[in-house]
Regions:
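Hydrophobic faces of well-ordered beta-strands that scaffold small-molecule active sites
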Residues: 31-36, 71-74, 97-101, 123-125, ...
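Mid-to-C-terminal alpha-helical segments outside catalytic/metal-binding sites
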Residues: 2-30, 53-70, 236-238, 252-291
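Hydrophobic alpha-helical segments and helix pairs
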Residues: 108-154
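Conserved, mostly hydrophobic/aromatic
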Residues: 35, 63, 86, 115, ...
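Short, acidic/polar
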Residues: 53-62, 105-115, 137-138, 192-193
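Divalent metal-dependent hydrolysis catalytic cores, especially in the metallo-beta-lactamase
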Residues: 46-80, 96-102, 120-128, 150-152
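Active-site beta-loop-alpha junctions enriched in small/polar residues
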Residues: 37, 76-77, 102-106, 126-130, ...
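Catalytic pocket-lining loop regions of alpha/beta-barrel enzymes
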Residues: 7-10, 135-241, 290
Length: 291
């Protein structure tokens, strides 16, 4: 049966057409945007939204416009486990880009080797968006990452990690949590979900200081400041920044990546801390600039 207008997942608006660098500080040389997507045209039916195209040339133009030296492309959920556009983009820019794939747990050794050769350095599990892979096969994905020297990346609300929190503390591979745990800042710092997020990060999780526009009401995202600062305080060497471009699955006013970077001036007022978040930490975690 053909899909009707009512059953087609909601269309997302395009990203801001003119991204700019931050106005409150100068982006240091070697900076890494650790979280963005490229979007093609073939989507899985179980997706949660319908994004406009975000081709590699637009993504690279965004990196250039915002003074980013390197970038990490995260497989977008609407493409499911078809990583072909991700791999194509990584292979075209092997020195500048790394990738995070979404893969079935029983992917062949040859296919995994192809992903690694292209520049994939981790696998993403996703409990939020249709087309993602959940946490039920965490052990399988841990084993894959351990064999390949990869890490795990989680897109989830922090409180949804409660059932697997004891397991996370015993993982044999590093892991990173997207978008500061997708936490509702209105719930406050005493909310169980935030307390769990802080505990996971204190115990060794990496955290992406990304998605401020998803957590906050409006720029300049002042309500995110105490939460981001708390994360940085407990994990200054495991905090990284990401633009989340092209901001899929969002229907508010599209943010400018420069404004998202400017929030980092409030989250990390100290220039040395910002350089760790933008340069030192992500280069180490994603394997950039290795001689």
């Amino acid at each position: 049966m053909n899909a009707t207008i009512d059953t087609v997942p909601r269309l997302c608006p395009p990203p801001h057409p003119h991204p700019h660098p931050p106005t409150r500080f100068r982006v240091p040389l070697g900076a890494v945007d650790t979280h963005a997507h490229v979007v093609g045209e073939s989507f899985v039916p179980e997706r949660s939204y319908t994004p406009p195209p975000a081709p590699p040339r637009n993504y690279l133009a965004m990196l250039d416009a915002t003074s980013m030296t390197y970038g990490v492309i995260v497989q977008v959920s609407v493409h499911g486990t078809d990583n072909s556009l991700l791999v194509q983009t990584l292979r075209a820019h092997p020195d500048r880009l790394r990738g995070i794939a979404v893969a079935p747990h029983d992917l062949s050794d040859a296919a995994l080797a192809e992903l690694k050769d292209a520049g994939v350095v981790g696998l993403r599990l996703n409990t939020i968006s249709g087309g993602g892979i959940g946490l039920d096969r965490l052990a399988d994905y841990e084993s894959l990452c351990a064999e390949l020297g990869w890490h795990l990346q989680f897109l989830t609300h922090a409180d949804r990690l409660a059932p697997v929190a004891p397991r996370l503390s015993q993982l044999r591979v590093p892991y990173v949590i997207d978008h500061m745990g997708h936490f509702d800042v209105d719930a406050g710092p005493q909310a169980p979900g935030w307390k769990l997020m802080m505990q996971l990060v204190a115990d060794g999780a990496w955290v992406k200081l990304s998605g401020a526009y998803r957590l906050s009401k409006t720029p300049p995202y002042a309500d995110t400041i105490p939460f981001a600062r708390s994360l940085i305080e407990v994990a200054p060497d495991r905090s990284v920044w990401g633009s989340d471009w092209p901001h899929v699955g969002f229907w508010g006013t599209m943010p400018n990546v420069g404004d998202l970077l400017d929030a980092l001036a409030d989250w990390a007022p100290d220039p040395a801390t910002r350089e760790a978040i933008l340069v030192t930490n992500p280069q180490r975690f994603y394997g950039f600039n290795r001689s």
